[in-house]
Amino acid sequence: MRKKSQQIKIKIITILSVILMAGYVHAIGFGDIAGGLLGGGGSDLSGSQDTLTASLNKTLTDLTTSQKIMFQALKKDKQVQLCDKVLEGLKSEDFGTKDSIDKVMESSSKLTEAQAEQIAKKEILDAESKVLFVTSIPFYIKGVMGAISTGKQAVEAGQSIASLNPMALLKIGALISIVSKTPDLLSQLSGTTSSLFEFMAANDIDSTEMKQKIKF
């Protein structure tokens, strides 16, 4: 299950290494050489940045919505409140800047960690909580599928980023942030999904659709 997400992570790490090298070369005063070796800044990635930002927003909205419902079913009020804060951040007009993406991704990561910790306990839900928990599954499926799609787009965008000169990189901070953080998101979701299958089995919740649609 983790093979594809690991391949995406390796590709992105390789791309980021090239980006870091470009920045270092420029910093020590060989910007012109870097431009010649690593390509010019003519390739406009603003469109890719907008597309990936929108994709990430939809992905995190679906994931956070599913997590909120799961935490409600598990009666974890503190985590429910954090979900609300993340959802507010995703709706903010400021979402799309590097700082806003970094902040939301960090909060989302903490939520996923908390989610993994809770479902690993395999708590048996009462009837009412079970009904509520089941309503989170469609959002979770959409969120994970969106994360996988975003990861693939991030690899493609990263390959284009690697050909830019350092000055051009300054214009796409949000895109670089998404490209760099997506592998960790996928890695987290891969492990959480495996635990979620076990939780659902313990609570006699059908996971057939999840297993059919979620392919890491």
Segments and roles (model prediction):
Residues 2-13:
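Bacterial N-terminal signal peptides that target proteins for export
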Residues 22-25:
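N-terminal signal peptide c-region/cleavage motif recognized by signal peptidases
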Residues 28-101, 213-216:
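Immediate post-signal-peptide N-terminus of mature secreted/exported proteins
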Residues 101-216:
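Extended amphipathic alpha-helical interaction segments
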